[in-house]
C-alpha cells in the first residue's frame, strides 16, 4: 500500500490576524532550483525555518504549513505561539496544536520572512516511520501561490520561476498540455473523466501531490459511481485523528493531461473515515502522486492553470503491494561490521557473516547505525498472513538480503514487483528468529 495517503488531507478553518507577504526571491534571480527526495511518489524538500534546516513534504493538498516532528533536531525556535484545535481525516475529534507567526522560511534563495506555522504536538501524527526518513512537516499553498512552479519527477527537482521569466511560459505552451484549475480553499481542483464501471463521469478532483496513491474516490460524494466488484480492504494511513481504512480496486479508466490510463488502481476510503471532512462543492476525489509522478507538471496558481507533459514512467503499470504487509521504520540500531582492505578497496562482513571466532590482523572493525524495519500491519487473508507473518515482527532478511541495508522504498518495490515472485522473509519475534515463505499474488 501507500502508507502516506491520508495524512494528506488537511482541513483547517482558521482566522488570521495579519496578511503574510509570501515567498519571494531573495536576490535578482530568474529561478531557483530545489533538488528533492522522492519516496513512494511523495516529494520531500529541505527548508530552513528560522535558520534550522528541516524536511518538508511538498503538498498541494494543504493550505497551511504544518510542523509535527522535531525529533532529529536539537532546537527550533518558533515565534508568537497561540494554542488552537485542528480537525481532519480519521474521526470527529480535534487535535491540539499551536499557531506560530512571524517565522522566516528559506530554500535556495526563495524566502518568506513572515510565515505562519501550525505545530502539532501529537507524536502519533509523525509519519517519518512510514517513509523511512525524518520528516518534520508539510508545506502547501503558500509555496505555490505567487509563482510558476515546475515539478520534474524524472529529474527530481522543483523549479520556482520569477514572474518576469517570460521565456519559460513560451516553452511550456509549445510542449505541455494546459488545463484550467480552480483554486478553492487555496487548493487546486480540475475536472476530468473517471470510469469505475462502464459509465464515464466528468469529475471534480483535488490535485494532491501529498497523496502517494494514484486516485482517491469518495463514493459518498458521488452516489452514481459504482464500486468495482473485485476489491481488497486496506489500511490507508493515519489522519489528524485516527487510522483511515478503505478499499482498493481496478477502475476502467482515468484521464489526466493527454493520457487516458487503463485499469489504474483506485482507492475508496470508508465513509466513516471522512465524516469530519468538509468537501468543496462537487468534489468527488483526489489525483495523487501515483499519476502525477508519471509527468512533468507546472503549477501556475496566479493564472489558475496547470501544464503537464508525459515523463519516462508514463506507461509503467499500476502495481500494488501483493504481500499484504505494511512495513515501517522503527528506529536505528548499532551494527558491528568487520572489513578487510584490499588494494584500496574494502570487503565488508557483518558479524554474522565473518563468524570466525577471531579477527585476522588485516581486518578492521567499524560500527554503523542501521535502520530497523517492522511489520506495522498485515492485511486480512493476504499471502503473508496465511504464511504466518504477524504485526510487530522485526524484519531481519528479505530474500537473503539484510534488511538493515535496504530502505522502505526498496522493500515496498520488492513486495509489489511481480505476481508469482517468491518472498523469503526472516523475522525476529520476541527473541525468536522465524522464516516464512510465500508467493506474491495479485487479487485485483
Pin down the residues of each PLM region:
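Bacterial Sec-dependent N-terminal signal peptides
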Residues: 1-24
Amino acid at each position: 500500500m501507500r502508507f502516506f495517503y491520508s495524512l494528506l488531507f488537511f482541513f483547517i478553518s482558521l482566522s488570521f490576524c495579519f496578511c503574510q507577504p509570501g515567498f519571494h526571491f531573495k536576490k535578482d534571480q530568474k529561478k531557483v532550483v530545489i533538488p528533492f527526495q522522492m519516496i513512494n511518489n511523495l516529494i520531500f524538500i529541505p527548508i530552513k525555518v528560522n535558520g534550522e534546516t528541516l524536511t518538508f513534504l511538498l503538498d498541494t493538498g494543504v493550505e497551511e504549513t504544518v510542523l509535527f516532528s522535531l525529533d532529529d533536531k536539537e532546537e527550533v525556535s518558533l515565534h508568537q505561539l497561540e494554542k488552537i484545535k485542528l480537525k481532519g481525516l480519521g474521526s470527529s475529534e480535534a487535535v491540539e496544536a499551536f499557531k506560530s507567526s512571524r517565522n522566516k522560511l528559506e530554500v535556495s534563495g526563495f524566502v518568506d520572512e513572515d510565515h505562519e506555522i501550525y505545530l502539532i504536538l501529537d507524536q502519533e501524527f509523525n509519519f517519518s516511520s512510514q517513509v523511512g526518513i525524518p520528516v518534520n512537516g508539510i508545506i502547501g499553498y503558500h509555496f505555490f501561490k505567487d509563482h510558476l512552479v515546475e515539478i520534474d519527477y524524472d529529474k527530481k527537482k522543483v523549479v520556482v520561476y520569477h514572474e518576469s521569466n517570460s521565456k519559460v511560459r513560451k516553452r511550456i505552451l509549445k510542449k505541455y498540455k494546459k488545463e484550467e484549475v480552480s483554486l478553492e480553499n487555496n487548493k487546486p481542483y480540475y475536472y476530468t473523466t473517471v470510469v469505475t464501471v462502464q459509465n464515464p463521469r466528468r469529475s471534480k478532483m483535488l490535485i494532491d501531490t501529498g497523496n502517494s496513491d494514484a486516485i482517491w474516490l469518495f463514493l459518498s460524494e458521488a452516489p452514481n459511481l459504482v464500486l468495482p466488484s473485485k476489491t481488497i480492504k486496506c489500511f490507508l494511513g493515519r489522519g489528524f485523528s485516527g487510522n483511515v481504512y478503505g478499499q482498493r480496486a481496478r477502475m476502467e479508466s482515468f484521464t489526466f493531461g493527454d493520457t487516458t490510463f487503463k485499469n489504474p488502481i483506485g482507492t475508496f476510503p470508508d465513509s466513516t473515515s471522512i465524516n469530519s471532512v468538509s468537501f468543496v462543492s462537487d468534489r468527488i476525489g483526489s489525483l495523487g502522486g501515483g499519476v502525477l509522478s508519471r509527468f512533468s507538471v507546472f503549477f501556475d496558481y496566479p493564472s489558475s492553470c496547470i501544464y503537464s507533459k508525459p515523463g519516462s514512467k508514463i506507461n509503467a503499470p499500476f502495481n500494488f503491494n501483493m504481500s499484504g504487509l505494511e512495513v515501517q521504520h522503527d528506529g536505528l540500531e548499532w551494527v558491528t561490521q568487520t572489513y578487510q582492505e584490499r588494494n584500496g578497496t574494502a570487503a565488508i562482513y557483518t558479524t554474522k557473516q565473518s563468524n570466525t571466532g577471531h579477527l585476522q590482523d588485516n581486518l578492521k572493525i567499524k560500527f554503523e547505525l542501521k535502520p530497523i524495519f517492522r511489520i506495522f500491519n498485515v492485511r486480512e487473508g493476504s499471502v503473508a498472513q496465511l504464511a504466518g507473518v504477524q504485526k510487530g515482527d522485526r524484519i531481519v532478511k528479505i530474500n537473503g538480503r539484510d534488511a538493515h541495508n535496504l530502505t522502505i522504498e526498496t522493500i515496498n518495490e520488492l513486495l509489489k514487483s511481480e505476481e508469482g515472485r517468491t518472498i523469503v522473509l526472516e523475522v525476529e519475534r520476541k527473541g525468536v528468529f522465524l522464516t516464512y515463505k510465500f508467493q506474491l499474488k495479485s487479487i485485483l
